[in-house]
Amino acid sequence: MERTLVIPRGMWEGLRPSLFPRDGNEGFIAGLARPCPSWNGIRYVLEKVLPMARDGLEYSLPAGVGLSREESSRINVISAKSARYGLVPVHLHSHPAGIPDFSGYDDQKEEELHSWLKEEGQPLLLSLVCSREGSPRARLWMNGQQEACSVRIGLQTFFPVSTPLIQLQALDRQRAFGQAFTTAVSRLQVGIVGVGGVGMPVAEQLARSGFCNFVLMDPDKVEAVNLNRLYGLSARDIGRYKVDVAAASIRRACRSAGTKARIRAFKADINTASTRQNHILRRCDLLLALTDDELSRITCLNLALDGGLEYLQAGVLISQEKGTGRIESIKTEVTGAEVGRYCPLCCGRLDPGQASIEARRYVGGEVWERALSEGYIPEEPAPSVMSLNAIAAGALVLEIQKRVAGLGMADLMQQDWLTGKTLHVRNAERHLTAGECVICGRQAA
């Protein structure tokens, strides 16, 4: 069973000043993680950082850090009680440059703490160490023993030193993303909800870059109007389920890359998916909402944040002037979400009002007919062309590759290919107005 300590990228960046003080001394942080089942083991997602008392450190030196007795007791009590809520205590501390691993002193103190926590009913203890300019390393204390544990910052995975790295000739040109890139993507499980004009090329591009574990969900079949914008389709594919077409494309791509595809495909609507189907999606590491309506994207967003998954959505929009049909904008967009920081609802990229209107479809009858008659639901589908879908798909896949390789992340990218206007936001929470979000948990500024 693989175990991974997951820290959202934005949270990690926020912790760095405390973990690596400007005076060069060591830093210490305590937090709580939530265990989330994954396909190959358990993800421990860091969700809560325990605030440190102003005088909580007894000493902080270039080669050592220690808590006061009062602060240590307070954190230990919280750590023990966290077991009642299914949470796991996490201790993070830094080392000087050149000392990348846990010290003998770390071993002794953590073993003593783990023994005490077990007696208090908390069977687990996670610990992380990171040297300045180095990579984080983690371990899990369980049953009196140390267990190997990977670290994932956002989508960037740091493996234990003993982990063998995958090398494939077909993927050699991706070496710029780092030696561990192929190994990392081969272990990530990707859920794709919506495998239409954007979702299908995203699936193939990911497969050709080494991803091989997929969960696909889409209730629709291929229609004649899809043939101009879905890769590799012909008239013979009309009537086939899109998830079956996408699965076949992924398998071909994986064979070309030298990997073996593992796919679960559901011919289901995310808004009416079964408990089992949602449970399987929840085990993914990354969830992509590539549908064309607000309701399904909000459903995906809730599922991802609740399950500790990385979330991204992408789409296209060709807007036309009412009456004349004149094109006013041609846009592609990629955005994401992070617990406690931002989400598409905070940023105005999803409209809950429109989602409530779309929900009337599932009520049916007079409710749906009235929504149609009053113009809340477009009578014609939005324009869509293969070239624009390909740009959105490529932008999304590149964003995923950047995140896996540790090359930074964008919270929101939008490009209007008609006017040339570009929006590229890295720290979305800094641009949001005061207020709280019940979806991502962002607190008032």
Predicted regions and their residues:
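N-terminal charged helix/coil linker that caps or initiates catalytic domains
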Residues: 139-190
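A short helix->loop->beta-strand "cap" motif at the edges of active sites that frequently abuts
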Residues: 122-125, 259-261, 307-309
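Conserved beta-strand-loop surface patch within small alpha/beta domains used
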Residues: 1-90, 96-158
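Glycine-rich adenosine-cofactor-binding loop
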Residues: 178-223
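Glycine-rich phosphate-binding loop and adjoining beta1-alpha1-beta2 segment
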Residues: 211-258
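Glycine-rich phosphate/adenylate-binding loop
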Residues: 135-142, 181, 189, 273, ...
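Short acidic/polar active-site loop segments enriched in Thr and Asp
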Residues: 87-89, 212, 310
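A structured beta-alpha segment of the ubiquitous adenosine-cofactor-binding alpha/beta core
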Residues: 243-286, 291-297
